[in-house]
Amino acid sequence: MPYVNIRVAGKLSREQKEEICRGVTEVIATVAQKPKETILIFIDEVDHENIGSAGKLLR
């Protein structure tokens, strides 16, 4: 059973999450030859203030 964990900075709409799930599921099913119903996708939304780059917080 494939597990895919996606972390994004900021918030996504429900529609964006659904589109990501559809697209990622299609790619994993095709490339890994796994049944779509076995693919789990986790989307973690992270506040910009909790992400650092080059020694500084994004916000």
Where are these regions (language model features)?
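A domain-level signal for the structural core that forms small-molecule/cofactor-binding pockets
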Residues: 2-59
